[in-house]
Regions:
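Hydrophobic alpha-helical core bundles mediating ligand binding, dimerization, or RNAP-core interactions
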Residues: 7, 11-14, 27, 51-55, ...
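Low-complexity, intrinsically disordered terminal/linker segments enriched in charged
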Residues: 111-126
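A solvent-exposed, acidic/Ser-Thr-rich amphipathic alpha-helical stretch
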Residues: 5, 20-72
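Short, cysteine-centered beta-strand-loop-beta hairpins and adjacent loop/turn segments enriched
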Residues: 57-60, 84-93
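Hydrophobic/aromatic beta-strand elements that line small-molecule binding cavities or substrate pockets
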Residues: 51, 64-70, 81-82, 95-101
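Short, low-complexity N-terminal intrinsically disordered segments enriched in polar/charged residues
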Residues: 1-29, 124-126
Length: 126
């Protein structure tokens, strides 16, 4: 079970933009990550490679400070907002909930929930 300080350190790493480093430093070796109802990706190395590839396609990824962070035993819920600017300069926003199950001080499972009708809508950079 993570303590709140450990979760806040994870959130700060993501907000700083070090998404791949956050996976390296805060996820279990056998962690899984799942988008809405798609099949989960499994294994920390797979998760880091997927994140690095996604970020490499972008000009910029801005992570807003978490809107809410709830910690209840091994369960953590974070409301993230991401602004992704593509190579042509168009910025799109994702507002999602990440539901995590921690094992000790690392994330074992994470699933993202968002409204597919509004996900990645075009916004002014912010």
């Amino acid at each position: 079970m993570p303590d709140r300080k450990r979760v806040e350190t994870f959130v700060a790493a993501v907000v700083s933009g070090d998404h791949v480093g956050a996976i390296r430093d805060f996820y279990c070796e056998d962690a899984s990550m799942q988008e809405n109802a798609t099949e989960p990706r499994r294994g920390r190395d797979v998760l880091m490679a997927h994140e690095a590839k996604a970020l490499a396609r972008l000009k910029r990824m801005h992570t807003h400070p978490a809107r809410a962070v709830l910690v209840d035993g091994d369960n953590v819920v974070i409301n993230w907002v991401f602004d992704a600017t593509d190579q042509s300069g168009v910025t799109r926003r994702l507002d999602e909930l990440a539901i995590q199950r921690w094992r000790g001080d690392r994330i074992a499972e994470e699933r993202f929930f968002y409204d597919t009708a509004t996900a990645w809508r075009v916004v002014e950079p912010g």
